Amino acid sequence: MKRRQFLSAALATTGAALAAETLLAQEAQAPAEDKRLHVAVNQYTCDTFYRRENVDFWTRLAEIKNAGVDGIEATLGSGNDTAAAGKRLADHGLAMRSIYTSGNLHDEEAGERELARLLEIGEKAKPFGTEIIVFNPAAKGGKSDTELIRQSKNMDTLGAGWKKLGIALAFHYHTTELEFGGREFHHVLCGTDPDNVLLCFEQHWSYRGSGNSQVAVFDHLKLYSDRVVSVHLRQSVNNVWSETFGEGDIDNVRLAAGLKKLPKTAHIVLEQAPENGTPKTLAPAEVFRRSAEYVRGMFG
C-alpha cells in the first residue's frame, strides 16, 4: 500500500515536529494490517454443504464470514445477477475478488451473443473489486477442431475485453476438457494469447480427469505455471472427496512448494464439496473453518 508523504520541509521546525508527532501517534493507534492469506470459498462449495442441511447458503453469509472465510467466488450468469451478488457479499464483509461463469464460445451462432453477455458481467463485477473471472467453456464432449479453434479465438477476444476492465480471464476445466488426450485443455492454453487468457489451476480435476494421477497434476502445473492466477483447492481420500480440505490423495506439501514458485501470487479458492461417500460429520461453517485454517497453515 502507498504510504502518505510527510509534511513539506518548508514548515517551521516546531510545526513540522508537532505534525510528525501527530502522524506517528495516528499510526500507532491504527490497527495492524491483516497479513494472513486471503482464502475464498466457491459458491458450489457453499451450496452443496448447506444443501445437506436443507439451508440456502445466502441466508448464512454472516456465519460463513465468521468461519474465517474472506470472500465468496459467486457463480453468475448475467450482469444483474453480478451486481446483486456483489452487494449482498459486500454487506456482510465478504470480498468478491473472483467470480465464476460459463458460456458457449465454440458455437458460431451463439458466439457474438455470448461475448456481449459475458462482457457485461465483467462491467458489473468491476465496481465490487473483482480481479479474476473464472471461465469454464460450455461443455461438449469431443468438440471438433473447428469448434476448438473458434472457441479459443472467442476466449482471446473475451479476455482482451475483460483485461481492459482490469479483470483477468482464468480458464477453468473439468474432466470433459481433459478427454481425448486433453486436446481442449491444451488448445485453450496453446491457442490463446497468454496476456488475455490465464489459468485457474484445478488441481483435483487435473487429478481425477487424468485417471487419478498425481503425475498429471504436477505436469499441468509445470507446463502452465506462468498462466496460473487462481487455484481451486479440493482433496480426496481414496479417490472420494473428503469433508474438509487437508491431507489426502494429492501431496499438499509438494503442491504448496509448486505454488510458491509461481511468477504471480495465485488467488486461493476452496472448492471442497461432498459427493457419494463423503463423510457427513461437520456443520458447513466448521467445514469452512477447518479447511481455511489448514490452507493458511500449508499455503500461507
Question: What are these language model-derived features?
Answer:
Residues 2-40, 47-68, 182-201, 205-300:
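Histidine-acidic metal/acid-base catalytic patches
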Residues 11, 18, 31, 88-91, ...:
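Active-site acidic/histidine proton-transfer and metal-coordination neighborhood
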Residues 41-45, 74-76, 98-103, 135-137, ...:
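A cross-domain feature marking catalytic cores of carbohydrate-active enzymes
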Residues 70-71, 95, 131, 168, ...:
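Residue-level detector of anion-binding/catalytic polar loops
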Residues 73-89:
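Glycine-rich, proline-tolerant flexible connector loops at the mouths of alpha/beta enzymes
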Residues 80-81, 105-106, 141-142, 178-179, ...:
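Short secondary-structure capping/turn micro-motifs that flank functional sites
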Residues 103-109, 246:
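The substrate-binding groove and active-site-proximal loops of carbohydrate-active enzymes
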